[in-house]
C-alpha cells in the first residue's frame, strides 16, 4: 500500500479542513499568486478582509488599476499561500477569483478601515473586491501530513459531494 493510499484511509477530510481553516483564519496576511501577461507568476502579500469556511471563500480589497486586477481580468486561476512557521504549518489554496467591481456593491461593503489604503476619493472610486472560491487545498502540517515533513503533499479536492482527500 502506498503512503498516499494509507493517508486517504487514515485521515479525515473534515479534520484536515478544520486545521487548514484554523491556520488561514489566524494569519492576517497571505500570499496571492496570479499569472502575468508574459506568462510568468506574480506573488504579493495580501491582507484578508474575510474568510468564509462554509463556502471556502476568501475576500480581499484592491485597486482596480493594479497589476493584480489586470492579471485577474485576464485569467482568474489563483493560488493563495498561508503559513505558520512556529507550527510547521503551510497551506496552499487553489481557486478561482471573481472581481467584484460594481460601485454600489463596493460602497455597500465599504468599511472605514479601508480608508488607510484608499485615502482619496479617486482611490475609493477604483477600489474593488476580489472573491476567491477555493477548489483545492494542499497542506504541509506537522502531525497531519506524512513524514518526512515537507516531502509529501496532502491534497483536498472539492467536488459536488464536498471535500475529499486525494493524496
Listing of model-derived features with the role each one plays in the protein:
Residues 35-37, 46, 63-65, 83-85, ...:
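Histidine- and/or cysteine-centered catalytic micro-motif in compact active-site loops
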Residues 45, 62-66, 75-79, 108-119:
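Short acidic (Asp/Glu) patches
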